[in-house]
A protein has these predicted regions:
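FAD-binding subdomain of flavoenzyme oxidoreductases
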Residues: 1-139
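C-terminal substrate-recognition/cap domain of FAD-linked oxidoreductases
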Residues: 99, 107-222
Length: 222
């Protein structure tokens, strides 16, 4: 199960965070069922310890061969700052989610599903200044919605944040929305969600204002 999640991973995590149970067949033809115990229904690294029950069955799927519990610190599943540790391919030996190689084929899975808040606004932010001045905006935006930030206090969340660098912008032939000549150095596309329309619009406007201070122009899709 690759560490997929798309831009909504900002709010709800990736595939690894939302797996509740999966069944796979190993190279010997035996069956393996993996169940996440005491799921926190959030990001895996935010849980102090994560546990998985592993049940192995014979090829018929009827005879239980072994049962064990795999336990590891939640923080070990994701590298601080980077978001994912590309150097850790093993992930504590958790079957089916290693980042390299194949230890089996997943044939069934159960997932944690999340309900999207009813109010959503998308902001498009185009940065025309130096890249070194634009990149800190990513941290400033995410901090605004974290606990302690004004966005979080208003009950508004950042559901997604997509980063397009200069090479990507050029490769896809990005059409600049601002009334400027040339393409931006960086583009951020964010989804801001909540239950109060006024609070969501206020947060979206504040994000645009923050980015205006970094030589960016912002647009809110209504």
């Amino acid at each position: 199960a690759m560490n997929a999640g798309g831009k909504k991973a900002v709010l709800w995590g990736t595939a690894l965070d939302n797996l509740a149970w999966w069944k796979m067949v190993d190279p010997d033809g035996n069956w393996l069922e993996v169940e996440r115990l005491n799921h926190n229904f959030g990001k895996i690294h935010e849980q102090e310890r994560v546990e998985f029950r592993l049940k192995r069955f014979d090829p018929s799927g009827q005879k239980l061969l072994s049962e064990s519990v795999l336990s590891m610190p939640g923080a070990s599943c994701r590298k601080t700052g980077l978001g994912k540790d590309v150097t850790d391919k093993f992930l504590g030996g958790l079957p089916g989610v290693q980042k390299e190689g194949t230890d089996g084929i997943i044939v069934a899975a159960r997932w944690v599903l999340h309900k999207m808040p009813p109010i959503s606004r998308t902001v498009c932010l185009e940065f025309f200044g130096q890249v070194r001045e634009a990149v800190p905006a990513i941290v400033e935006i995410t901090d605004y919605f974290k606990p302690g930030g004004a966005g979080h206090a208003a009950g508004v969340q950042l559901a997604g944040l997509e980063h397009l660098d200069e090479r990507y912008v050029k490769a896809v032939g990005y059409a600049t929305k601002a009334k400027r000549h040339g393409r931006p150095k960086m583009v951020l596309i964010g989804d801001i969600v909540g239950h109060d329309e006024k609070a969501v619009m206020s947060a979206a406007s504040e994000v645009v204002r923050m980015c205006n201070l970094r030589a960016a122009e912002g647009f809110i899709a209504v």
